[in-house]
Amino acid sequence: MIVEKILALRTCANNMADHCGLIWPMAGPVECKFWKPSGLHENGLTGLLWGKGVGAHLSAHADARWVVCEVAVDEMLQLAEEGMIKFPRATVLFVGNRSQALDYIAANMPLYGAALQLAAPAAPAHVHMPAAEPSAPATQATSATLPTPATPSTQATPSTQSTQSTQSTEATQSTEATPVATVAAAPPPPGQQHDVMAKKTETGVYGSTLTGADQSRLVAGYGSTETAGDHSDLIAGYGSTGTAGSDSSILAGYGSTQTAAGRSTLTAGYGSTQTAQEGSRLTSGYGSTATSGSDSAVISGYGSTQTAGSESSLTAGYGSTQTARKGSDITAGYGSTGTAGSDSALIAGYGSTQTAGSESSLTAGYGSTQTARKGSDVTAGYGSTGTAGADSTLIAGYGSTQTAGGESSLTAGYGSTQTARQGSDITAGYGSTGTAGADSTLIAGYGSTQTSGSDSSLTAGYGSTQTARKGSDITAGYGSTGTAGSDSSLIAGYGSTQTAGSESSLTAGYGSTQTAQQDSSLTTGYGSTSTAGHDSSLIAGYGSTQTAGYDSTLTAGYGSTQTAQQDSSLTTGYGSTSTAGADSTLIAGYGSTQTAGSDSSLTAGYGSTQTAREGSDVTAGYGSTGTAGADSTLIAGYGSTQTSGSDSSLTAGYGSTQTARKGSDVTAGYGSTGTAGADSTLIAGYGSTQTSGSDSSLTAGYGSTQTARKGSDVTAGYGSTGTAGADSTLIAGYGSTQTSGSDSSLTAGYGSTQTARKGSDVTAGYGSTGTAGADSTLIAGYGSTQTSGSDSSLTAGYGSTQTARKGSDITAGYGSTGTAGADSTLIAGYGSTQTSGSDSSLTAGYGSTQTAREGSDVTAGYGSTGTAGADSTLISGYGSTQTAGSDSSLTAGYGSTQTARKGSDVTAGYGSTGTAGADSTLIAGYGSTQTSGSDSSLTAGYGSTQTARKGSDMTAGYGSTGTAGADSTLIAGYGSTQTSGSDSSLTAGYGSTQTAREGSDVTAGYGSTGTAGADSTLIAGYGSTQTAGSDSSLTAGYGSTQTARQGSDVTAGYGSTGTAGADSTLIAGYGSTQTAGSDSSLTAGYGSTQTARQGSDITAGYGSTGTAGADSSLIAGYGSTQTAGYDSNLTAGYGSTQTAREDSSLTAGYGSTSTAGHDSSLIAGYGSTQTAGYNSILTTGYGSTQTAQESSSLTAGYGSTSTAGYDSTLTAGYGSTQTAGYKSTLTAGYGSNSTAGHESSLIAGYGSTQIAGYESTLTAGYGSSLTTQQNSSLTAGYGSTEIAGYASTLMAGYGSSQTAGYESTLTAGYGSTQMAEHSSSLTAGYGSTGIAGQDSSLIAGYGSSLTSGVRSFLTAGYGSNMIASYGSSLIAGHECTQIAGHKSMLIAGKGSFQTAGARSTLIGGAASVQTAGDRSKLIAGADSTQTAGDRSKLLAGRNSYLTAGDRSKLTAGDDSTLMAGDRSKLTAGKNSVLTAGANSRLIGSLGSTLSGGENSTLIFRCWDGERYTNLVVRTGEQGVESDIPYQVDDEGNLVGKADDDLVLDYDPGMILDGQCSPGTGEELRDV
């Protein structure tokens, strides 16, 4: 009994390595060097106790080794997994497969004391394994010991020491005849019921047949046949046939045939045929055929045919054919054909054909054809054709054709054709054609054609054609044509044509044409044409033409033409023309022309022309012309002209002209002119002119002029002029002037002037002036001054004193004193004192004192003091003091002090102080202080301080400070500070600081700071800082900083920074930074940074960075970076980077990068990169990369890469790569690759590759590859490859390949291959192959193959094959083959084959075969075959076959065969065969003599009268001596010819049947 020990089961890899890399022994102790007693699997050895538990950590590989080891109990740790233990060391007792290991544990458990404590049955233990591959068989050849449960002699016996194992003592007798070892199994131990499997190992020799039992290992030789039972391992030789049971592993040679049961592993050689069942894994060689059951994995070679059951995995080589059922996974090589059942996944190579069942996934290579049913997922390569069932997803490559069932999703490459049914989703590439059923979604590329059923959604690329039925949604690219059924929605690109059914929605791009029926909605781009049915909605772009049925809604862009019928609504852009039916609504843009039927509503933009019938509503923009029918309503913009029928309502903007008939209602804007018919109502804006018929009502704004006839009602605004006919009523605003006819009623606002005739009624507001005719009535407000003619009525305010001449009207306030001249009007406040000359008008507040000369007009606030010269006008606030010279006008706020000289005009706020020179104008806010020279004009806000010299004009906000020189103009915001020299103009926002020298013009926003030199112009946004030299012009946005020298012109956006030298021009976007030298011009977008030296011109987009030298010109897109030397010209797209030295010219697309030396010219497409030395010219397409040294010229298509040395010229197509040294000329088609040294000339077709040394000339067709050293000339057709050394000349047809050393000349036809060393000359026809050494000359016909060493001369006809070493001369007819060593000469007729060593001479007739060693001479007639060793001489007749060793001489007649050893001489007659050893001479014919050296074989061909026989004798045997001539006599005896005839008693060793026995000729040739 073994105590304190247990058995553990574990697995290792086939090389006995565990997962940590430790190599376990086949038997004996093993230990972990990094032991840690933790609960983790790391840092220790693991296994299952007694082989029971969860086997998740055991290997599932078929070739895994199952190890049983012995472990000490006290060193064992229990892990978390059921049955898993960990230990630091163990002793390996057994290695085998799974079943063997479990049998071993079950057999040996009774020997262990620890096992007796387990409550487990004695049956074998079982390991719960996950689903895995079948285990590999264990064989005697793969284990150190092969134990069985009952044979201690064949297994390691557990012991207390656990360190020893008993080796097998059974020996295997091995013999040559039977190389099979058999080990028999002993009976199992008592109590154990296990199947005992025979263990067998068989090794087969050449052509052997092997049959093995179960669990056998068979190794088979060439062409063997194997048959093995279960759990076998077979290794098969060439052409073998293997049949193995389940759980077998087979490795097969070339051309083998294999049949394996389930759970097998098969690896097959070239051309093998495999058949495997369930759970098999097959790997097959080239051209193999594999048939596998379910759960199989198949990997097949080139051209293989595979058939796999369900849940299989197939990987196929080139051109393979695959068939797989349910759950299969197929990966197919080039040109393969795959057919898979449901739940399959197929990945197919180029040109493959795939057919998959439901729920399959197909991925196909180029040109593949795919067919998939329900639930399939198809991804197709270029030109593929895909047909998928319902619930399929197809992604197709270029030019593919796809057909999918319902609920499919299709994505197609360029030029694809798609057909999909219900619920499909299609995304199509360029030029694709898509047809989809109901509920489909189509997205089509450029030029695609789409046809979709109901409830579809189509999105089409440029120029696409779309047709969709009910419920479709179409989005179309540029120039597309869309036709959609009812409930459709169409969005069309530029120039598209759309036709939609009822309830459709159309959105069209520029220039599109749309046709839609009932309930459609159209949105059209620029210049589009729309025709929509009833209940439609149209929105049209610029210049569009729209025609809509009734109940339509039209919105048109600029210049559009619209025609709509009943119940339509039109909104038109600028200059549009609209014609709408009854009940229509029109809104027209600027200059539009509208014509609407009855009950229409028109709204017109600026300058529009409107015509509307009965019940129309017209709203017209500025300068519009409106003509409306009866019951119309017109609202007209500024300067509009309106003509309206009866019962119309007109509302006109500023300066409008209105004409309205009976029952019209007119409302007129400023300066409008209104003419209204009877029963009209007119409301006129400021300065409007109104003329109204009888029973009209007029309401006029400020300064309006009104003329009204009988029964009119006029209400006039401030300063308005009203003339009303009989029975009129006038109400006039402040300062209005009213003239009224008889029986009129006038009511005037404050300060209004009223003139009324007989029977008039005048009511005047405060301070109004009323002049009334006879029978007039005047009511004067507080302190009003009234001058009234006879029979006038004056009403005076409280306490006023009124003095009026005849006909005057006086209204005086209480306590006021009024002295009025004749015809004067006095309005006096209470307690005021007024002294007025004749024709004066005095209005005084209470307690004020007014003194006025004749013709003066004084209006004084309470307690104010006013002194006015003649013809002066004073308006005083309360407590103010005013002193005015003659002809002056003073208006003062309360408490202000005003002093004005003659001819001044002063308006002062309360508490202000104003001092004005003669002829000055002062307007002062409260608390302001103003000092003005003569002829000045000052306007000051409250608290401001203004000081102005003679002739200045100042307008200041509150708290501002202004100092102005003579003849200056200052406008200051509140809190601003302005200092101006003479003849300057300053306009400042609040808080700004402005300093300007003489003759400057400054306009500043709030908080800005401006400093201007003389004769400068500054316009500053708020918070900006501007500093300008003399004669400069600065315009700055808010927060910008501008600094400019004299004569500069700066325009800056907000937050920008500009620094300009003298005579510079800067235009900066917001946030930009500009620095310019003198005489420069900078224009920058927002956020850009520009730096320019003198004389530069920069125009930059937003975010760009520009640095320019003197006299440079930069134009930059947004985000671009430009750096230019002096006298350069740069034009950059957005995001580009430009760097140029002096005198350069750069034009770059967006995102491009250009670096140019001086005197260079660069034109770059978007995303291109250009680097040029001085005096270079570069022109590149988008995405190209150009690098050129000085004086180079590069022209490149998009995506190309060019690198040129100085004085080079490169012209590249798109996607090409060019590299050239100095003074080179390269011209490349698209996709080509050219590399040239200096002074080279390269011309390349598209896709070609050229590499040239200096002073070379290369001309290549498309797709060709040329490589040359210096001074070479290469000319190649398309697809050719040329490699040449220096000073070489190569000319190649298309598809040819040429390689030449220096100073070589190669001329090749199309498809030929040429390789030559230096100083060689090759001329080859099409399809030929030429290889030449140095100083060689090769001339080859088409399809020939020539190989030559140095100094050789080869001339070959078409289809010939020549190989020559150096110094050889070969001349061959067509279809010949010549192989020669150095310094040999070969001449061959048509169809000959020649092979020669060095210094040999071969002359062969047609269809001859010659093979010679060194220094040989062979002369052969036609159809001869010669084989010679070195320095041999052979002379043969026709159809001879000669084989000789070194230094031999052979002479043969026709149809003879000679074979000789070294230094032999053979002479043969007709049809003789001679075979000799070394140093022998054989002569053979009918009755010929043969001589052989030592160990030679002599073959005699004899005729016995019935048939030929071959007699073979060997020297040294049976009395046949070496170097003795022999012959066969008539009796068939071998006769020696030494001295006398000697008849030998000879038993022939080999007699060959002469009746062409199979293999006879081949045997002789092999010998």
UniProtKB/Swiss-Prot annotation:
UniProt keyword annotation of Repeat present: yes
Region feature (Disordered): 130-195, 270-329, 356-378, 449-474, 502-529, 594-620, 642-668, 689-716, 738-764, 785-810, 833-860, 929-959, 977-1004
Cellular compartments per GO CC: cell outer membrane
Residue stretches of biased makeup (Polar residues): 270-282, 302-325, 356-373, 449-469, 502-519, 594-613, 642-661, 689-709, 738-757, 785-805, 833-853, 929-949, 977-997
Alphabetical UniProt keywords: Cell outer membrane, Ice nucleation, Membrane, Repeat
Domain of life: Bacteria
MF terms (GO), sorted A to Z: ice binding
Keyword DNA damage listed: no
Main location: membrane
Compositional bias per record (Low complexity), positions renumbered to this chain: 130-185, 283-296, 520-529
UniProt-listed Pfam families: Ice_nucleation (PF00818)
Its membrane topology: Peripheral membrane protein
Entry's localization field: Cell outer membrane
Family note: Belongs to the bacterial ice nucleation protein family.
Biological role: Ice nucleation proteins enable bacteria to nucleate crystallization in supercooled water.
Miscellaneous comment as given in the Swiss-Prot or TrEMBL entry: A structural model is suggested in which the ice nucleation protein displays a symmetry related to that of ice.
Domain notes: Contains 153 imperfect repeats of a consensus octapeptide A-G-Y-G-S-T-L-T; further on a 16-residue and a regional 48-residue periodicity is superimposed.
UniProt protein name: Ice nucleation protein
Provenance organism: Xanthomonas campestris pv. translucens
